[in-house]
Curated annotation (Swiss-Prot):
Residues of the signal peptide: none
Protein name: GMP synthase [glutamine-hydrolyzing]
One Pfam match: NAD_synthase
Record's function text: Catalyzes the synthesis of GMP from XMP.
GO terms assigned for molecular function: ATP binding; GMP synthase activity
Biological pathway: Purine metabolism; GMP biosynthesis; GMP from XMP (L-Gln route): step 1/1
Length: 510
């Protein structure tokens, strides 16, 4: 399938460019800014987008693409920093702005014949985020839009198929921004194909059949949306040659195991369940540091999974639910970010086990995985399931983990999820759960004094988990959740609601 290529110069918004294009059923991929010209040509893109970035084009070490990119015989769109690169390369001028533009700006269209701004209102609000600005465009460019402080907000060179905007059409703050990106792909690049869940499914199954052939695949099935979609794709591609492994760590929620067993039965795939609760709780005994808990669980999970996987001696492949943001981050121009928390997966397994990787979701975002799941016929109980951390309930019990506290938290967490489902707020929230706090509070039940633990309810709205806002649940829903937990769950006598956003907080407490 044809694609639009996006060269990443370090913008925090680069992934949004891809998301906006894909929402318009336009397939695109993100590559590092320094990708070789020959590699780009080999992909035969319909067009190229130069992303924004935090650098100054004149700064020491500023990211620059392969020089031959500027003469590529394909349409090119420069966004913010990308526009400045096009300007400087063509003999234009970029200087520091007297007044930096950060935030909203009113854009006025100056050219009614603009292909890039076709169908846009004459005035619209756009999101600016730049300290440098273009103060002279190359001679072949004509100015198509301005703001009160930016005389070159958009410009075009139709003859050489070069287009540029100083604002960010990819962010939701820019009115009709998706239309600008759609115009670039559909009108300027002539992109005609439609990238849909059905086409994704067909292409993925065909690719896996070609890669795997008559081979056998091991898949770690957790019951979450990613691993479930991977298993469903593989079931269609190779059928009985798929071996699924479910490790019951004892740190899972009520219903997780049963849901996974039901999925395996529906898909008619082999499922091996490993009961490892005793092993995990023994290793976690007395451990209170959250990072140590994560590392113990991650290492032990790999150990258990590897031991079980080796029993399938005819397996040559390991399937993983790697998503596109992970791929992008691994090749990012920005380099390694600070590690806030260790991530739990089986990434170390293929090398140890001499297995080849199968990653059918590696070019998909989370919302696309959910759409693919629906196309595959997976139910809402799987496709719309809230994210659940790899270490499970261990990072929702603050302090040491033990079976009585796990049972208490499981009961409270089930009530939270059940009440949200009854009220319809499960669909309006991105993630919701209970946390067992390491404090005891005084209470009164009947005529007796109690001294028991407190629980916290956490419910957030988000798109991808990178940022999140706390969900404004109705008081009656909160009241039902609190009342049921106090009445039905032994060991809890107080319920609080977390109203912190991310940032500054994280979604999980540990």
């Amino acid at each position: 399938m044809k694609q639009i290529l996006i060269l990443d110069f370090g913008s925090q918004y680069t992934q949004l460019i891809a998301r906006r294009l894909r929402e318009e059923q336009i397939y695109c991929e993100i590559l590092p800014f320094n990708t070789k010209y020959e590699d780009i040509i080999a992909l035969d893109p319909a067009g190229v987008i130069l992303s924004g970035g935090p650098s100054s084009v004149y700064g020491a070490g500023a990211p620059k693409p392969d020089p031959k990119i500027f003469s590529i015989d394909k349409p090119v769109l420069g966004i913010c920093y990308g526009m400045q690169l096009l300007a400087v390369n063509g003999g234009g001028k970029v200087t520091a702005c007297k007044k930096r533009e950060y935030g909203f700006a009113e854009v006025k269209i100056k050219a009614s014949t603009s292909k890039l701004l076709k169908g846009m209102p004459k005035k619209f609000t756009a999101w600016m985020s730049h300290g440098d600005g273009v103060h002279a465009m190359p001679k072949n460019f004509k100015v198509t839009a301005t703001t009160s402080t930016s005389p070159f907000s958009a410009a075009e060179d139709d003859k050489n198929k070069r287009y540029a905007v100083q604002f960010h059409p990819e962010v939701v703050h820019t009115a009709h921004g998706s239309k600008i990106l759609k115009n670039f792909a559909r009108v300027i690049c002539g992109y005609k194909e439609k990238w849909t869940p059905a086409s994704i499914m067909t292409a993925s199954i065909a690719a896996m059949k070609k890669q795997i052939g008559k081979g056998h695949v091991i898949c770690g099935l957790s019951g979450g949306v990613d691993s479930s979609v991977v298993a469903a794709l593989l079931a269609k591609a190779i059928g009985k040659n798929l071996y699924c492994i479910y490790v019951d760590t004892g740190l899972l929620r009520t219903g997780d195991r049963e849901r996974t067993e039901g999925l395996a039965k529906k898909l008619k795939v082999n499922l091996k369940i490993v009961d490892a609760e005793k092993l995990f709780l023994t290793k976690l005994a007395g451990v209170t540091d959250p990072e140590k808990k994560r590392k113990i669980i991650g290492a032990l999970f790999i150990e258990v999974f590897e031991k079980e996987a080796k029993k399938f001696k005819d397996a040559q492949f390991l399937a993983q639910g790697t998503l596109y943001p992970d791929v992008i981050e691994s090749m990012s121009v920005k380099g390694p970010s600070d590690v806030i928390k260790s991530h739990h997966n089986v990434g170390g397994l293929p090398e140890k086990m001499n297995l080849k990787l199968v990653e059918p979701l590696r070019f998909l975002f989370k919302d696309e995985v959910r759409a693919l799941g629906r196309e595959l016929g997976l139910g809402s109980e799987i496709v719309d399931i809230h994210p659940f951390p790899g270490p499970g309930l261990a990072v929702r019990i603050l302090g040491a983990v033990n079976k009585p506290d796990l049972d208490t938290l499981r009961a409270a967490d089930f009530i939270v999820r059940e009440e949200l489902y009854k009220s319809g707020w499960d669909k309006k929230s991105w993630q919701a759960f209970a946390v067992l706090l390491p404090i005891k509070t005084v209470g009164v039940m009947g005529d007796e004094r109690t001294y028991e633990k407190a629980a916290c309810v956490r419910c957030v709205n988000s798109v991808d988990g990178m940022t999140a806002d706390w969900t404004k649940l109705p008081y009656d829903v909160l009241q039902k959740i609190s009342g049921r937990i106090i009445s039905e769950v032994r060991g809890i006598n107080k319920v609080v609601y977390d109203i912190t956003s991310k940032p500054p907080s994280t979604i999980e407490w540990e």
